[in-house]
Curated annotation (Swiss-Prot):
Subcellular location: Cytoplasm
One Pfam family, short name: SmpB
Upper classification of the organism: Bacteria, Pseudomonadati, Pseudomonadota, Gammaproteobacteria, Pseudomonadales
Annotated source species: Pseudomonas savastanoi pv. phaseolicola (strain 1448A / Race 6)
Xref: InterPro entries: SmpB, SsrA-bd_prot, SsrA-bd_prot_CS
Protein name (Swiss-Prot/TrEMBL): SsrA-binding protein
Protein function: Required for rescue of stalled ribosomes mediated by trans-translation. Binds to transfer-messenger RNA (tmRNA), required for stable association of tmRNA with ribosomes. tmRNA and SmpB together mimic tRNA shape, replacing the anticodon stem-loop with SmpB. tmRNA is encoded by the ssrA gene; the 2 termini fold to resemble tRNA(Ala) and it encodes a 'tag peptide', a short internal open reading frame. During trans-translation Ala-aminoacylated tmRNA acts like a tRNA, entering the A-site of stalled ribosomes, displacing the stalled mRNA.
GO molecular function annotation: RNA binding
Gene name linked to the record: smpB
Length: 160
């Protein structure tokens, strides 16, 4: 049986909703404490980061709301909890910066992506400020105008 290949880019999953809902100000790279069955599921890209966030408690960071679906071939004597809280590994300096920023009004810490870094699984977390509804509409308008501009440039090149 052939082995499953890792994603060539290294990215396992992304949280696109977080980029839509928050102005991302700072990004951090954190290690994840995982069980064996979770690593196998991540190799098969069976993870969802939508609605996942980082909880800062007692000088530690915890990933909440991340759903890792267990494989059907996983062990039967290990009870797999797909939505359990997973510990994030960060430096003390990074934890202090996150804690002080999250205590300010309007800031949140969310998970952006899970990816491979050599043989380790890392989680990119970000410190962001929540967008209002009009901010989201403004971003969408900008994206649409950029798309229109790109279309115009491409069609002009084809006409020549």
């Amino acid at each position: 049986m052939a082995k499953l290949k890792k994603n060539p880019t290294g990215t396992i999953a992304q949280n696109k909703k977080a980029r839509h809902d928050y102005f991302i100000e700072h990004k951090f790279e954190a290690g994840l404490v995982l069980a064996g069955w979770e690593v196998k599921s991540l190799r098969a890209t069976k993870v969802q980061l939508v609605d996942s966030y980082v909880l800062l408690k007692d000088g530690e960071a915890w990933l909440m709301g991340c759903h890792i679906t267990p494989l059907k071939t996983a062990s039967t004597h290990v009870i797999a909890d797909p939505t359990r809280t997973r510990k994030l590994l960060l430096n003390k300096r990074e934890l202090e910066k996150l804690t002080s920023s999250v205590q300010q009004k309007g800031y949140a810490c969310v998970a952006l992506s899970v990816y491979w870094k050599e043989h380790l699984i890392k989680c990119e977390i970000a410190l962001g400020k929540g967008k209002k509804e009009y901010d989201k509409r403004h971003t969408e308008r900008e994206r649409d105008s950029d798309r229109e501009l790109q279309r115009a440039v491409r069609s002009k090149g084809k006409d020549d």
